[in-house]
Swiss-Prot record:
It is an enzyme of class 6 (ligase). Composed of two chains; the small (or glutamine) chain promotes the hydrolysis of glutamine to ammonia, which is used by the large (or ammonia) chain to synthesize carbamoyl phosphate. Tetramer of heterodimers (alpha,beta)4. Residues 1-186 are annotated as: CPSase. This is Carbamoyl phosphate synthase small chain. It comes from Xylella fastidiosa (strain 9a5c).
Amino acid sequence: MTEPAILVLEDGTVFEGDAVGANGLSVGEVVFNTSLTGYQEVLTDPSYAYQLVTLTYPHIGNTGCTDQDDEANKVWAAGLIVRDVPRRPSNWRSQISLSDWLAARGVVAIAGIDTRKLTRILREKGAQHGALMAGEIDVDRAQDAARQFTGIKGMDLAKVVSTKQAYSWYEGQLDLDRNEWKRAAPQYKVVAYDYGVKLNILRMLAERGCDLTVVPAQTPVDEVLALCPDGVFLSNGPGDPEPCDYAVAAIKTFIMRRVPIFGICLGHQLLAQTVGAKVVKMRHGHHGANHPVQDLRSGRVMITSQNHGFAVDEATLPSNVRVTHRSLFDGTNQGIELLDVPAFSFQGHPEASPGPHDVDVLFDRFITMMAAQS
């Protein structure tokens, strides 16, 4: 027999369903993601910290879960909201069902609700503060928790999810035929700032010959320069970039030293912020694996994976910055490059996981940039 569960929004809307994870109470910003698959990668993506993730596809959990698909060493999403979870997964790689995986990792989750109705609310009203409660239900307590949540705006979550110690990374992507991780001969020394980095980003860099040192978000610039890097990578991550003054200070120095820079997601916003641009909170953000983005230089349209609730305000970019990519959903900025130094960034996720690989050429561009600089 399943336990009851509820989702309560800050506007007072209550959804009743069944618990499909751990019992308890969890609060966060309620967002929706349109990906059909990749639920495990989504939940373990540090960019989803303090977010209650609604998956719009009705059947979630069909392929179970496997340790190889984690994007971090824990679940970072605050909770999961779905329409239906199958009783039995079917996939040759599956090690455990989604429900058991959620329970084992202490994730509060709800199934059996009208996710279409919820998504319409989020589209019309914007991302909502919410509370998930499973097991012993107290609607008033859940509603109070939802309304007391202060929101992600103004929260510096990069230093919360970041690694506490520097480490090296050499592992490439998974070779499914051999069931082993690929390796490549290291050619370029790259320091990756961990603002909430996904493992597949590190794998794609390592596979292209990057000798990676991953450092905490607040690592002083002098410690990084002492490693004599050929390039610096600015990772994805959760929260608002505005409070991350420590990151802006470091990036300014790398720009002055002309160290090649590549940023993704939060790293993109931090690069833009460093050169003087403003970053604004979006109404409901971009979360999904089917977002069309146009390369303004070639005119090519690429389908991309997206996960962000803030966007760079193009009108505030200085004259020495060129806009390279733009969303075809809402026209928001998706990429920039500095004209006078070797630095560029992309708002979406070229590493996918989950999603298409249309934009993985950006990793190759970073390699080419370091080769030219050296």
